[in-house]
Every structure is written in structure tokens, then in C-alpha cells.
């Protein structure tokens, strides 16, 4: 058994290229390639309400973003699709989505983007999607005069479902050929997850001075996320898949499957 470290986008590419047999994957990349993959049971990253680390920060209310330029981070495709679904289906707007790298500049108000100019490439951004630490900081201390919105909370409020951001998956061919190995790895990962959750308060205290954030905030963040994958997460993933189809980021609803000892079982 060999462990391969890597950022999420690299791990996504490697399992799809057959360079990895089992890997965490972003939800949208799993859904786009579900025919060749199987879900590992009871492992994932989800929220059932606030997520605290995915935020839309806007200089205007989200219902006023129609035609406005909205920056979407290039580091999280799942969050990108989530933002599109919420903006189009729940807030009823169709912004101009602008891919950008993390650490970009500030926002401009609606007066800086007149209707005659707001689709030009040089126009300023009116809203931006933040991921990870920047989102955590923005939601902790919102900038005055902005709308700072937790997208996990909005998803659950509008749909009633939890939001699944990442799953653990195995290549289907590998899972069918080596079911015992997949089951063993699943058990190891589950035990590691449980140990990490027990150590979450200590981890929060260690990270607090490095991140310049209160330990209580970090501990709340760790406890807010859900790290399992059961029926509620499956329902949430299916709901997200439906939204992704409707906004054009998924061609069709995939047939989902998960691994079990000795077989690949359909996830109904």
C-alpha cells in the first residue's frame, strides 16, 4: 500500500488517470465520472447547515447580482457549482461568472458596474466566492457594507438537504477485483477519522496561533463538518447532482454505486 499526498485537484486527476486506486474526490468530479467509480461507505465531507469555509461576499444583496461579475475561485469546482445553483435557482439571478485565482483584489459596488459596461472583461467584481481560511475569516468578521453568506447554510435552508463537498472513491475496476483490500482501506480510514475527531480540540489549540484565529472558532469549525456518508449524505449528493444538471455543469444524473465487501452495491 502506497500513500500519495496531493492537493484535491491533483488527486482528482490521478484517480481518473488510473494512477491512484482509492482517493478523496470533489463531489462534482466524482459525479462527472461516477460510471468508473464507487463510493466508499461512511466517509466524506459534508455540512448540514453552516459549513463556515465557503462564503459568497458581495457588495450588493445576492438578489441584485443579475448580470454582475462574480469571481469564482479556481481551487474548488464543487463550490463553484454550488454557488451557481444558489444564485440561479434560489436568488433568481444570472451573473457573469469570472474564474480567478485565490488572493485577488477587492469588490466594487453596483455604481462601479453600469449596465452598459458590466459584461466587459475589465469591469470590477461585485461579488466573490471565498474558500477555506479566507471564507472562515470573512464569516467570522464580516466586512462592513458587504453581504457575507455561508453557502452551506443557504443550501440546507433552501433544499432541506445536507451538502456533500467531497467523497472517498475507488476505481470501479479495482473495487471489483480487490474488494477485500478496499474494505481494509475503508476500515483504516474510518478509524483514522474517528481518532482525528477525538483530537479535534487539541488540534484547534495548536492551529489557533498559527492561523491567528480563536481556538474556539476552529474547534466549532471542525465539529460543524460531517465526515461520514450515510443515507442523508446520499440524498444530499443526489440533490446536488440534480442542481448541477440544471445549471449545465453535469450532463445527466449519474448512477451512483458504493463498495461493499465482495461486491459493488447500488446506492439507491
What spans do the regions from the language model cover?
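Short helix-initiation/N-cap motifs at beta->coil->alpha
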Residues: 2-13, 93-107, 112, 116-127
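Beta->alpha turn/N-cap motifs
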Residues: 7-9, 19-31, 36, 41-43, ...
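Hydrophobic residues within well-ordered alpha-helices
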Residues: 15-16, 244
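A conserved helix-loop-strand patch within extracytoplasmic ligand-binding domains
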Residues: 43-103, 148, 155, 172
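Periplasmic-binding protein-like
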Residues: 46-55, 141-174, 217, 221, ...
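Immediate post-signal peptide segment of exported/extracytoplasmic ligand-binding proteins
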Residues: 62-68, 246-247, 251-254
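Pocket-lining segment of extracytoplasmic ligand-binding domains
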Residues: 99-107, 118-204
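Secondary-structure end/capping motifs
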Residues: 176-243
Amino acid at each position: 500500500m502506497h500513500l500519495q499526498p496531493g492537493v484535491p485537484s491533483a488527486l482528482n486527476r490521478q484517480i481518473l488517470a488510473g494512477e491512484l486506486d482509492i482517493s478523496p474526490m470533489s463531489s462534482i468530479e466524482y459525479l462527472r465520472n461516477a460510471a468508473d467509480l464507487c463510493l466508499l461507505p461512511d466517509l466524506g465531507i459534508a455540512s448540514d447547515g453552516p459549513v463556515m469555509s465557503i462564503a459568497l461576499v458581495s457588495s450588493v444583496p445576492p438578489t441584485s447580482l443579475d448580470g454582475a461579475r462574480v469571481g469564482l475561485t479556481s481551487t474548488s469546482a464543487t463550490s463553484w457549482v454550488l454557488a451557481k445553483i444558489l444564485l440561479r435557482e434560489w436568488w433568481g439571478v444570472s451573473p457573469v461568472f469570472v474564474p480567478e485565482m485565490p488572493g485577488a483584489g477587492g469588490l466594487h459596488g453596483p455604481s462601479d458596474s453600469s449596465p452598459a459596461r458590466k459584461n466587459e472583461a475589465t469591469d470590477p467584481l461585485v461579488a466573490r466566492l471565498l474558500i477555506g481560511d479566507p471564507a472562515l475569516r470573512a464569516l467570522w468578521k464580516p466586512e462592513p457594507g458587504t453581504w457575507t453568506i455561508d453557502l452551506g447554510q443557504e443550501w440546507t435552508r433552501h433544499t432541506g438537504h445536507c451538502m456533500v463537498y467531497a467523497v472517498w472513491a475507488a476505481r470501479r475496476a479495482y473495487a471489483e477485483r480487490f474488494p477485500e483490500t478496499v474494505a481494509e482501506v475503508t476500515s483504516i480510514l474510518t478509524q483514522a477519522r474517528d481518532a482525528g475527531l477525538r483530537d479535534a480540540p487539541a488540534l484547534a489549540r495548536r492551529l489557533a496561533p498559527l492561523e491567528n484565529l480563536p481556538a474556539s472558532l476552529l474547534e466549532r469549525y471542525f465539529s460543524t463538518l460531517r465526515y461520514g456518508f450515510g443515507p442523508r449524505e446520499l440524498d444530499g449528493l443526489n440533490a446536488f447532482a440534480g442542481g448541477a444538471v440544471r445549471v449545465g455543469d453535469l450532463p445527466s444524473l449519474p448512477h451512483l454505486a458504493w463498495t461493499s465487501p465482495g461486491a459493488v452495491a447500488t446506492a439507491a
